[in-house]
Each structure stands twice: as C-alpha cells, then as structure tokens.
C-alpha cells in the first residue's frame, strides 16, 4: 500500500537528489521530520530494516544536498541504513515492496538505481571500494568526489582498517563518514564540538595547516611542535588519533541529527584534498521512542502498528533452529565447563542471548571479525577447550582460509554451528546460504551434517561437540517441524543415514530420493505421489556409502535433494561415489541452480526453484519422461 504523499508536502518536493538540492536550506529540518515519519509508516506496513534508517535521515539528506550524486559516488556500507537514500532517489513509491519478491532490493543494488554505486549486504566493504573509485576519479580529473558511509560496527572489521591504511599511503581525495550510533562519546557532541568541526574543516584553517607544513618541512623540530600542538587541541575534544595515524584528516564527532550543521561541515570537507574522516554521532531508531529504547529489537521488523509501541509476537509456536542451538549450548555447558561459544556479532540472530547471560565467561562476541572468530577457536581447541563457532552460512565464507589453514589442517575439534543455511528469504542474494556444502565438502578432515528436523539438529550438535576433529552442522533460518525433542543427548553413528519410506512399486522405474537436510518433508510429499523410496541421508561427509550402494542396486533412478548449490554439493558427492564404484545409474540432482537467488519468502523461493513437494514431483516426472 503506497502512502499518501500529500501528507508529506515537503518530502513530495524531493523525489530525487536534484529536486532536493533545489530546496532552500531552511526547509530541510521539516523535510527530515517528514522523511522519518514516512519511513516509519512505510516499513511498519511492509516489514524491513527500521532502526538504522531512522538514525541516518539527516545524514542522508545532507550528503545528497552537498554532493552531486550520482556523478559523485556515495557508498553505503552493508545497507541497512540506506532506506532514506532509496526514498530520496526516485524509489519512494516502491518502498512498500522492499524485501519482497520482485520488489525493491533490501540493500543498495547497482541494477536497481544509478544512485547505488556499490551492491552491498555484507559489512565493511565500502572503504575498499571507495578507495578504488577515488584512485580512478583522480586519474580521470573530473573532480568527482567519493564518499563512504560506514557504521561503528562495520568499521571494527579488519578489512575496513586495511583499506584505511592503504588510503593513508596513496592519499586520494575521498571521505569516510563514520555513522556512530553507540553514543559511547555522547558528551563530546554539542555546540563546542560542532564549532570545532567548522574550524578544522574550514578553508582558512586548512590553508594555514597545509601551508605551514610546506614552510616548516625543512625545520623538523618546529614542524613536530606544530603537529603536536594541533593533536593536543583536537585530542581535548575528539577521539580521532587512530584515524589521523592512518593518514586521514579527522573531523568530529558532530551531531548527526543537525542537518544544517552537517551541511556546513560537509561543504567544507568536499573541498579538502586527501583522505578525510568525518565522525558523525547518531541515535539508532531516532524519532520513534520504542526503536530508540530497543534498537536491536527494531533493527529488522515485521509488519506492525506504530501506535501500539510494540512488535507483534510470532504466532508460530514451533521453536526456531536458532533457539534449538541456543538451548543446546545451555544444556551442554551445564555438563561441559570447557565449552566455549563464539559469535561474530550475531548473538540475537544465532539464538545465543540466553547462553550469553547464563554462561558469560564461556561466551565470546568478537564483533564483525569472522576470520578472527575461526582462529580464536583454533587457539581454544589447542588449549584443550571445546569451541563452537556460531556463524551464518554466508558469513563463514569470510573465514574460509582460516577454516582450512587454522582448523582442518591441524584436525582440531572445532564445531561450526552454521545458521541460515539454504534459502534465507527477504535479504536476497548476499545472504542466501547457498554454498557452504560445496566449499566445505572438499576440505579434508571435515565432518558435515545436515539435520532434517529440530531434534535431529540437537543430536547432531551433540555429535559434533563430541567429535575429535572439525565438524559442521548446517540448519536453516526459521521454525522447525514441530517434532518432539529428546531431552537426553545421543551421538549419532558417523556417516549413517536412515530410510524414511520404501517404495512398493512393482512396475515402471523405481525411484529413490536421497534427501540432505530440512527439505525432507517435501521429498516425502513428492514420494507419496510417485511411490518412491526416501532416505534421510543426515551426513554430507562422510556419505553413507553402504546406503547409497544399496539404493543404487535396488532402484532405477536416484534423486538427490539439498538446499545448497547443485555445483559441488551433496548430490555431486553421490555421483562421484557411484562413478568410483562403477555403479553407473541415472542420478537427478535437485538443489539451488547456478545463479544468485533473489529475495522472496522461503516458501515463494522453494516453489519458484522447484524445491517444494509439487516441484520435486514435477522434476522427477520430467526426468523419467526423457
């Protein structure tokens, strides 16, 4: 449902940055108020990321007002905070479709708009990309400006500091804006600091500073005195020493909710040469009290009524796989004081809130540092402890070298609890857990498990925790099947699947479906129509070779089913084994195709990709008809 824009008269005048830049500065505070209200009303009707965008309204308006986008390049890190940017860049009327199938992309996306310079979704990539663009902008000589906006969480990642270190070396004209919404230094925000930002970014101060450097370059003692005096002045009111040491001219912190002061500072900084760093203080959830009070809860929201000041409770009473994992941690830690749980900034999403409170000394949130998380676990395993790394499938990609070099080569007992495996839904291409089976299956020493339901997940987590080598349990986003959970733990026999249904077909081609993971109910649904055998394979590595040989000998066609890329996945492993054994048999691999999977609900995407019950049946019938 599109909102009535007549209720937002100032915002109606700024459908594009060109229109925004034509407005007098005096109306911009009113524009920001309307934009914030529009964002709240829009997201509450459609679902999406809310708190981050509420906090970047003034910053977004100021950036588009000062910089000549899209000629100037504006890059948003991750993209959760870019909803105001989408609204101001010609996509206002499409906002009700965001994160929905065939709708607006949840993050800045190059194919969607010329204003989206970089397609994003994962954190900490913006400064590297901005640096590359800034270097090339300097070579083309058209006075193109490049700006990267990065949050205080994303900037903690090593990649961001690698980029800043390089930028300080090559010294291009670029601006990094730190959107700091943690309020850790809020006492430094105010009139004095805004005034200092004006002075330090102003042309007079900059000219004196740069001119003085040239004049005094031959007099090291005096040059050093000037440098130390400047640092002392700035150090009294700003925490920018680190960024100065990396080669940036640091300005801030400034009030990120004073749009007119932001514009003054940005106009000054636009004319400065070399790498610039602007530290902006914002409040996540700004303007909507519940989101200000609970920015984590209002980070991503379902549809809700803003007047109720609370989010609706899920009507699904079945536990999520994330909760199954979190409860396992607590139950296991009660038995094992050497259990150590590690997460790269995904406490809530991975279901670890309860564990972090009940076992704080065994809980480690390493921030957005996937590489470090994996090798931290290595050190703990070497020390004789039992580390578990809780990580999303798409983010484990960022720690792949560490998985091989620091865990698997030494055959260390580190378990990876891989959440969001398979189709994740509304976050689209950057967040689908499409590749983990493919990129792990080729690693020696790995034990890889794919549960069909929540109880199997619980027992596999226990199995992995007991295993004396690297292991992984991969499970999807969302709720379980509603099966009864066994309170006791039972280690599964490694590499053994189980038959769930046996075909009674006496004529025609006999089919066996080998299911890996939570698509098992869909396989059983299709099997009822086809009178097919179904096996819950459980283990991707090692495969249940005896079961595969048995099914190959007693069936005419084998079908593998997985919520992973077909290329290199579990089905590929089945074919490799059959070829090795000279068991030449027709095999149909069903899974994710060779493409990046777009956004949509899990149910919508399963249907579109032919992985629901009807789609599996259809694919098998088509294969048999060939």
Swiss-Prot record:
GO terms, biological process: 1-deoxy-D-xylulose 5-phosphate biosynthetic process; isopentenyl diphosphate biosynthetic process, methylerythritol 4-phosphate pathway; terpenoid biosynthetic process; thiamine biosynthetic process
Pathway: Metabolic intermediate biosynthesis; 1-deoxy-D-xylulose 5-phosphate biosynthesis; 1-deoxy-D-xylulose 5-phosphate from D-glyceraldehyde 3-phosphate and pyruvate: step 1/1
EC supergroup of this enzyme: transferase
GO cellular component: cytosol
InterPro entries: Dxylulose-5-P_synthase, THDP-binding, Transketo_C/PFOR_II, Transketolase-like_Pyr-bd, Transketolase_BS, Transketolase_C, Transketolase_CS
Subunit structure: Homodimer.
Record-given protein name: 1-deoxy-D-xylulose-5-phosphate synthase
